[in-house]
């Protein structure tokens, strides 16, 4: 298989009634474990990173960190028999989301839920426009589940 758009993985899963884990990595050990599990199960894999992971991997430079993860995931995916995608999880900063898109992420999430709904929609629409122009999928957090997220520790 190869490095694919996250939407492709999710559409196939929906059509065939199965779930796909999207797992955050913070180090190479997590990455290797997730890839090995995917290989063993012959299942697609969605690798996720946070804004903090980009900063860490890039030694303070989030674009360099995003490029590092794209290069890592793509180099592995080329030799695998399973589809693999790379997703930015809960991107809260517009500029960081754009860096992930430019670096070559399969998909990004914009989490502008801290803003009023109209501003959230405005920022989300801008990210969708940028991402879709280069074939990147977008997940958006347009609100929150009141009561459920309040006391999660």
Label every model-predicted segment.
Residues 18, 53-64, 106-123, 150-153:
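Glycine-rich tight-turn/loop motif centered on a GG-T
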Residues 20-24, 45-49, 84-89, 108-110, ...:
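Hydrophobic faces of well-ordered beta-strands that scaffold small-molecule active sites
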Residues 1-21, 74:
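N-terminal amphipathic alpha-helix/helix-capping segment at the start of soluble metabolic enzymes
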Residues 26-28, 50-54, 89-93, 113-115, ...:
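Active-site beta-loop-alpha junctions enriched in small/polar residues
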């Amino acid at each position: 298989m190869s490095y694919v758009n996250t939407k492709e993985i999710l559409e196939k899963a929906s059509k065939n009634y199965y779930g796909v884990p999207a797992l955050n990595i913070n180090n190479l050990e997590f990455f290797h474990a997730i890839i090995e599990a995917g290989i063993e199960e012959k299942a697609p894999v969605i690798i996720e990173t946070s804004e903090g992971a980009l900063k860490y991997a890039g030694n303070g430079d989030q674009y360099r960190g995003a490029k590092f993860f794209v290069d890592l995931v793509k180099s592995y995916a080329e030799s695998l028999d399973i589809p693999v995608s790379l997703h930015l999880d809960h991107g809260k900063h517009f500029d960081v989301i754009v860096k992930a898109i430019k670096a070559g992420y399969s998909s990004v999430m914009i989490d502008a839920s801290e803003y009023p709904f109209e501003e959230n929609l405005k920022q989300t629409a801008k990210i969708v426009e940028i991402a879709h122009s280069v074939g990147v999928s977008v997940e958006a957090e347009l609100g929150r589940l009141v009561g459920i997220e309040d006391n999660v520790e």
